[in-house]
């Protein structure tokens, strides 16, 4: 549970206050959890036998197999990369690499092993909501100039909300994940109690997250959100004839409104909307041009080492080897930070090769497979709950086209994948797990 508070940790005494504390805290919590988990297996024979059977059943689940394959190839790519040491340990600034990926995998397997009931997952989501709210409160205090809080100030030109994450782009996708948890809680725990104090607290957090999202002003996440809404509503319309017409109209309204805002993004009316930057979606924007250069460099790097890539954390070597002078303009300085390709597609292709990229994609294909295979389960998720899963995955993948994964996205991605493994157990696997539990 404590891992979901990782997002709140800010260590102002370090050179990278928004990053270092998070990965140190996460690793400590996961390591301690693993130690106590193993001690429990060692000293409780009856419980350990059940856990072994449970794990055996889990490793027959297609999604668990896919996640395991991705992590395995990620580590293998580092071992055979241009700098295995750096691929595994990363650096002080990023704190990623193989060591962090191993911790995320342990986290993934621990929650799958220990969270056997719906109430366990709901409690985890409550912790995630708490972390999201605290992240936002930190940003408010920092924005107001409170002593001891670092980050963007409200008075800064072109202010964008950074929270306790330090980067508006990751604030945006983070609140989309926390909104998924909030909506799931409303659809389950508070389905018939929407006026209760718990439900009202969730509605309040959703409103807070909406404001944060708006002031984070991140175009990739905005496009991801719109795509998620359209696809999720489309799925509901496809599976529910009764609501099909109303949902089709809703999708049409969303598309028209967004289209108008994008078409007239240069008007004074639109520019007065907080976070109006998100409506400026053009390929002429400097941020897009910078990324286009980095994607070309990443593609060339992939062609040089197509199987397992250059190794995690080694994009900087590709950037140096194939440096494009158009990236640096004396009048404007350099663009996006150049140790990443700023795209989940090009980052995984360049750093883990075609094998790593296919393993990454296989996680979502496997999710789609168990999603489909479990559709006839009488005790399975409702169509609305299924639409939430579709929405958050679509939002994550779309925004990831122009952004790379970091700790605050990885922890949510692995949480959602673990929860999907639990929620969409296909009949044969579900029977084994329930018997073993």
Which functions belong to the PLM regions below?
Residues 1-14, 27-40, 71-79, 97-110, ...:
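Alpha-helical transmembrane segments of multi-pass inner-membrane proteins
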Residues 16-17, 86-91, 214-219, 400-407:
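Membrane-interface helix caps and helix-loop-helix hairpins in membrane proteins
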Residues 17-47, 51-76:
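Hydrophobic alpha-helical transmembrane segments in multi-pass integral membrane proteins
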Residues 22-23, 88-98, 159-160:
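Non-cytosolic membrane-interface motifs at loop->transmembrane helix junctions
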Residues 52-54, 423-437:
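Arg/Gly-rich low-complexity intrinsically disordered repeat tracts
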Residues 85-92, 185-191, 323:
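Short juxtamembrane and helix-loop transition motifs at transmembrane-helix boundaries
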Residues 142, 147-162, 271-289, 296-297, ...:
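Interfacial juxtamembrane loops and adjacent helix segments
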């Amino acid at each position: 549970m404590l891992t979901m508070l990782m997002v709140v940790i800010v260590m102002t005494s370090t050179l990278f206050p928004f990053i270092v504390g998070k990965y140190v805290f996460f690793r400590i919590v996961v390591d301690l959890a693993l130690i106590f988990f193993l001690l429990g297996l060692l000293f409780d024979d009856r419980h350990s036998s059940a856990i072994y059977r449970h794990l055996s059943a889990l490793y027959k689940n297609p999604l668990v197999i896919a996640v395991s394959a991705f992590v395995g190839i990620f580590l293998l790519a580092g071992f055979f990369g241009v700098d295995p040491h750096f691929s595994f340990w990363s650096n002080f600034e990023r704190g990623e690499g193989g060591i962090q990926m191993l911790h995320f995998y342990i986290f993934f397997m621990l929650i799958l092993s220990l969270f056997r009931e719906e109430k366990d997952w709901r409690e985890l989501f409550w912790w995630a909501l708490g972390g999201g709210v605290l992240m936002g409160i930190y940003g408010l205090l920092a924005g107001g100039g409170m002593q001891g809080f670092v980050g963007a100030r409200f008075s800064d030109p072109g202010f964008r909300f950074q929270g306790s994450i330090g980067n508006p782009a990751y604030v945006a996708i983070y609140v989309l994940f926390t909104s998924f948890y909030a909506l799931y809680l409303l659809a389950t725990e508070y389905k018939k109690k929407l006026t209760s104090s718990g439900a009202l607290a969730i509605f309040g957090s959703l409103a807070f997250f909406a404001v944060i999202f708006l002031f984070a002003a991140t175009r990739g996440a905005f496009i991801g959100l719109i795509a998620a809404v359209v696809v999720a509503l489309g799925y509901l319309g496809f599976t529910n004839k009764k609501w099909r017409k109303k949902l089709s109209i809703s999708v049409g309204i969303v598309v028209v409104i967004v289209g108008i805002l994008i078409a007239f993004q240069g008007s004074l009316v639109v520019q007065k909307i907080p976070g109006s930057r998100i409506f400026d979606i053009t390929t002429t924007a400097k941020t897009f041009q910078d990324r286009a250069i980095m994607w070309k460099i990443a593609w060339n790097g992939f062609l040089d080492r197509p199987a397992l890539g250059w190794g995690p954390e080694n994009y900087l070597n590709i950037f140096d080897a194939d440096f494009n002078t158009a990236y640096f303009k004396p009048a404007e300085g350099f663009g996006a930070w150049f140790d990443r390709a700023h795209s989940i597609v090009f980052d995984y292709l360049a750093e883990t090769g075609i094998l790593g990229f296919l393993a990454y994609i296989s996680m979502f294909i496997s999710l789609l497979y168990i999603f489909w295979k479990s559709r006839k389960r009488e005790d399975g998720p409702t169509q609305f709950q299924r639409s939430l899963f579709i929405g958050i995955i679509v939002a994550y993948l779309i925004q990831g086209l122009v952004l790379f994964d970091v700790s605050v996205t990885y922890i949510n991605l692995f949480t959602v994948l673990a929860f999907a493994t639990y929620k969409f157990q296909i009949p044969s696997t579900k029977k084994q797990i329930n018997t073993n539990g």
